[in-house]
Amino acid sequence: NDEGVVFTFNKEFSYVYPMNAAGVKGIEGTITVELGGMLRLLPQDNMSTKTVGNAQGFRSVKYSVYGKYPYGVEQDSLLVRWRLQIPKDKKKNYNRGQKVLPENPLVFYVEQSFPDRWFPYIVKAVRYWNKVFEGIGYKDALLVRKLENDVSSVTPKALIAYDLSDPVVANNLIFHPATGEILHCRINIGHGLWKEERERYYLLNGLDDNGSFIDFDSQKMAGELLCRVLSEEIGQVLGLQTIESKSAKEDL
């Protein structure tokens, strides 16, 4: 890979379930677990830094400045952000108010294990943020594609994964400590997302729903729920701080 070195470990585990009743043989078998990783090279040309200043609601990295004052240390913070730049040959168009494609659009790859029926809702969640970027002059700043079967899930800069082992939704970022440039992000959508959100909705709005409960078993409703949750996670990996929702009913 041009950006680093990819490596994988495969480990095989054996298991045996004891007999549940006399004369009944226990279940046994093996399972192979693959652990992947990637050593990435930092960019040779550092992205320009941007201090937080009066900006509110953005993720940041704190650092200490030594030597500026003879008897003290100054604390400051850099905004955490992706490197989305305007191509040099399109700057005139951009200055005229035309929407332009960024030099390197951010591509969200969807892991192979993600069920196909949810892919349209993932696309919808990503395109929601494109409307935001259009407000600052970018066109199609975010793209979404399915990860090919022969490509390791550790290689994309932005990955949306389907987690069968963990019911929660989570994300993580890796960024350049000196510039705040985001280098990699991963969003995990837990298999238990819908069960958790159903319980949350009933807990917050059960008495106010007047008997017209939302049909969580509907694929359309489940897809719209995924779209909402995923759009919030995308906002966080784009550099926004977490915003807690006040009402599950308002969300849906």
Model region roles, listed by residue range:
Residues N1-F114, V132, L147-A222, L226, ...:
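Auxiliary tRNA-acceptor-end handling modules of aminoacyl-tRNA synthetases
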Residues L101-P102, V123, Q236:
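Low-complexity, glycine/serine/threonine/alanine-rich intrinsically disordered linker
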Residues P115-A141:
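Zn2+-dependent metallopeptidase catalytic core
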Residues V123-V126, C227, S231:
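Hydrophobic face of alpha-helices
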Residues W129, G180, G239:
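Divalent metal-coordination and catalytic microenvironments
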Residues V132-E148, Q241-S245:
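Short, well-structured beta-strand/strand-turn elements
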Residues I234-A248:
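Catalytic Zn2+-binding segment of zinc metalloproteases
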Residues L252:
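Post-HExxH zinc-binding segment in Zn-dependent metallohydrolases
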